[in-house]
Amino acid sequence: MVHYISPAPLTFEVIDKILSKNYKLALSEDSKKLINDCKAYLDHKIESSAKPLYGITTGFGSLCKISISKEDLSQLQANLVMSHACSLGEPIHQDIIRLMLLLKAHALSLGKSGVQLVTVERIIDMFNHNVLPVVRELGSLGASGDLAPLANLFLPLINEGEVWYKGKICDAKAINAKLGWAPIELGAKEGLALLNGTQFMSSHAVYALLKAFKIAKYADIIGALSLEAYDGRIDPFLPQIQAARPHPGQIETARNIRTLLEGSEFQQKEKTHVQDPYSFRCMPQVHGASKDSIMYVASVVEREINSVTDNPTIFMEDDLIISGGNFHGQPLALVMDFLSIALAELGSISERRTYRLISGDRGNIPEFLVANPGLNSGFMIPQYAAAAIVSKNKQLCTPCSVDSIPSSNEQEDHVSMGGNAATKTVKVAENVERILAIELMNAAQAIDLQR
């Protein structure tokens, strides 16, 4: 199956299909025309204009006052990619690398970047042949785009760097030769278009959100099972309560749990307690608030992945090349901090339900979910593990977007730290999956003990 990159917006549903069903990528004819027309326009402007064009006929960052001769324009771009390729730390997940390639190809195809068609086609070839550049998680300030990681992503275009190929890290030059791919001679502005952009942040954001959509669903299912095991009351999930405070996520969560427990033999039993602890009773309010937050974050990220975030930006229809600030990652930095908090709360309330299930405070299930507590420790220590992970998430949820360290001789005097916000949000999401898995195991054991 093939996804044709076109001016049509990317959606999470489309991206999920591309990743999960191993779609190939191709450029639509509309996108090819936009790329070619923009490149021709840029070449004409360089030839006909004596006016300096940032990053095209000048140096970069605080070196923007230095003019570059026309003979050196291609070398300028190659030098940029090589000098900026300094991402550090652990290699990022290969699905996130695939997302980076997809999102960059989509952004460049919108016809405002001035790149060669052959460059975009090579990015697509890398995606389709699963030749994935090695990109590491540290090094982006999240302003001027994601310079260091994107430089590592595109080193293989010029026969440099390393790639994942058939499960191994290989020299990019060797894999290019094996596949018959000649190195790309970067044109004017092209290195800048590749490196200036928010695709490191946005690919992590998309990856985290695809997990978040599932986590929000699983939290309701696992929470409903825990409510059953704990002999909890259904009353707090009745529609009248939700109508009195009609937040969409709250209404959805309560409806989900009512549906899951409809006809349950446990719910038909007489209850001796008047109410349940908050971790059960307030699932609609807590899960629902996280759901609403996730949907807000998704709206921002979907807008971002369909935007042009390199600089300068070319507007052929207005005969303008504008040096602006669309590369600044503040929109993503803020919502990634928000998403990490929303997800962490799903983990926090889950761990509290796990604690209640092993506490023996209801009398319907034994302490630590084991027939002979004392002789056996039962499910004591999985709760320790969940608590440790919850604590770790609290550390990770310290906002990154409140920080800024100036760079490039103060030319770039405010940065978003969105790269750090995005990478830690993926870690929070993965941690919440672990916490929910522990709750599921405890809830299933508690149910079995009552059969």
Residue ranges and their predicted role:
Residues Y54-I68, D72-L76, S83-H106, R136-I158, ...:
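FAD-binding core of FAD-dependent oxidoreductases
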Residues M1-A50:
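N- or domain-start disorder-to-order transition segments that initiate the globular core
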Residues S109, A151-E162, S203-A216, D220, ...:
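Alpha-helical support elements that line or immediately flank enzyme active sites
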Residues S226-S348:
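Accessory "access/gating" subregions that flank catalytic or transport cores
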Residues L10, V14-K17, K21, I66-I96, ...:
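Glycine-/small-residue-rich beta-strand-loop submotif within the FAD-binding core of flavoenzymes
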Residues S203, P239-A243, C282, S323-G324, ...:
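Short beta-alpha connecting loops at secondary-structure transitions
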Residues A143-N152, V297, V301-S401, S407-S408:
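Glycine-rich anion/phosphate-binding loop at the beta-strand->alpha-helix junction
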Residues P149-N256, D403-P406, N420-Q450:
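Mobile "lid/hinge" segments at catalytic clefts and subdomain interfaces of large enzymes
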